[in-house]
């Protein structure tokens, strides 16, 4: 009769090692992601004031009131983020294509040029655009010379300035995923398309662009998500009439001290972005995001 082999439990031998390696990440996520989200969710269902204190009353009216009172800011956040994402894609795709296929030994240098301005803070970059778009600046002068801006017209404190600032601030978030996706593309596939008498335009839309879709999806997500919650660009490049939801949340949290409304707005914005992202990824037909 052969001896029965010992049973291996969860903590026997090295079976526990994967769980031990997973534990620090789980603790980090639980402490710095799950806990703040749950706290924000709890705050959004409270009522009261900073003087009398807040208490949890499951006040779902905070959500309905927040949505109906700030519909314009909701729509503006989605609109500005969408425009900035589209502009970033139009600007960055040719740039990423050139770096991936034409830059040769200058690839690393060009990538450094793309990211170098972003070694400075977000705030400083935004303030630089305030100088660039100033009424006495060269950009306004060029626009007026070309007849794109009437005499006395201005770019600063307009929706144009806000969208331009958002687009600029998130360009690397679009460029780098696109470059990574294009750089991995097998060039022989493009050559094969040419051998089959496909012109450059046909080869691009039939081969290059579809194969680079993971980079397009990743870039648009990395751009749209932070852009929708941005409030710095409106504060320095726009006016209250261009305010986005991030500006309202900032004001409610730090100025008005209306924590339940601010929390409800934050949760609603997160849920809206999550739904839009889910629909976009499903529509794009890819889950392989680089």
Predicted regions and their residues:
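Glycine-rich helix-loop "coupling/hinge" segments at transmembrane-helix boundaries
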Residues: 52-56, 231-257
């Amino acid at each position: 009769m052969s001896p029965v082999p010992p049973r291996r439990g969860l903590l026997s031998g090295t079976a526990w090692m994967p769980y031990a390696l997973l534990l620090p990440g789980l603790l980090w996520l639980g402490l710095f992601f799950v806990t703040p989200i749950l706290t924000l969710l709890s705050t959004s269902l409270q009522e009261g004031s900073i003087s009398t204190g807040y208490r949890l009353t499951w006040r779902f009216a905070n959500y309905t009131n927040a949505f109906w009172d700030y519909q314009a800011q909701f729509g503006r956040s989605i609109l500005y983020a969408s425009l900035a994402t589209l502009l970033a894609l139009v600007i960055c795709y040719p740039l990423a294509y050139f770096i991936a296929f034409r830059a040769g030994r200058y690839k690393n240098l060009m990538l450094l040029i793309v990211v170098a301005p972003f070694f400075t803070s977000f705030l400083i970059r935004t303030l630089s655009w305030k100088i660039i778009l100033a009424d006495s600046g060269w950009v306004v002068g060029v626009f007026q010379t070309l007849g794109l801006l009437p005499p006395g017209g201005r770019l600063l404190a307009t929706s144009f300035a806000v969208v331009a600032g958002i687009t600029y601030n998130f360009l690397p978030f679009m460029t780098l995923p696109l470059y990574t996706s294009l750089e991995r593309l097998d060039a022989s596939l493009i050559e094969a398309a040419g051998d089959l008498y496909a012109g450059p335009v046909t080869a691009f839309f039939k081969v290059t662009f579809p194969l680079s879709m993971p980079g397009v999806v990743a870039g648009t997500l990395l751009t749209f998500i932070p852009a929708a919650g941005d409030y710095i660009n409106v504060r320095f490049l726009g006016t209250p009439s261009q305010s986005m939801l991030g500006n309202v949340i900032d004001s409610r949290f730090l100025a008005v001290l209306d924590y339940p409304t601010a929390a409800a707005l934050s949760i609603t914005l997160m849920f809206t972005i999550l739904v839009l992202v889910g629909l976009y990824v499903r529509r794009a037909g890819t889950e392989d995001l680089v």
